[in-house]
């Protein structure tokens, strides 16, 4: 039971630190957590936690690239304001390219990956503000393009 409480305390401290939007590296997060008494924390643990909670790097008010948590910690839905983060959707003969607001690509890609092959998505690769999406077997690029436009209520 003691271990669970320690883990919960770590998660609470981790989320609180990310809400400050001032940590630009995993090393800085490790150091801050160690200063809070989590002596056994290391960079690989912080990396796993960032992934687990869907943290993204984005610009803060001072225009510094920092880690932060998305507004929703669960799998995002298209009824949330996420569609406002999609700026442009285009395609060629092989892939669909989605341009997002800075820092939003990984969040949008996570949503698309959660839809999966049945919706025509084989997989995504996300950077900071760009996503490459490839269609699943049996789906044409144009079909995937139209489906993504409809999903984010973009105009043709």
Swiss-Prot record:
Task: Give the disulfide map.
Answer: none
Places the protein is found: Cytoplasm
Q: Provide this UniProt record's keywords sorted from A to Z.
A: Amino-acid biosynthesis, Arginine biosynthesis, Cytoplasm, DNA-binding, Repressor, Transcription, Transcription regulation
Q: Which residues form the signal peptide?
A: none
Q: Pfam families this protein is in? A: Arg_repressor, Arg_repressor_C
Q: Name one GO cellular component term.
A: cytoplasm
The cross-references to InterPro entries, in alphabetical order and at most eight, read: Arg_repress (IPR001669), Arg_repress_C (IPR020899), Arg_repress_C_sf (IPR036251), Arg_repress_DNA-bd (IPR020900), WH-like_DNA-bd_sf (IPR036388), WH_DNA-bd_sf (IPR036390)
| This protein's pathway | Amino-acid biosynthesis; L-arginine biosynthesis [regulation]
Show the GO MF annotations.
arginine binding; DNA binding; DNA-binding transcription factor activity
GO biological process terms held by the UniProt record: L-arginine biosynthetic process; protein complex oligomerization; regulation of arginine biosynthetic process
HAMAP family per the UniProt record, alphabetical: Arg_repressor
Q: What is the protein's known function?
A: Regulates arginine biosynthesis genes.
The name under which this protein is listed is: Arginine repressor
Whose protein is this, by species? Edwardsiella ictaluri (strain 93-146)
Organism classification: Bacteria, Pseudomonadati, Pseudomonadota, Gammaproteobacteria, Enterobacterales
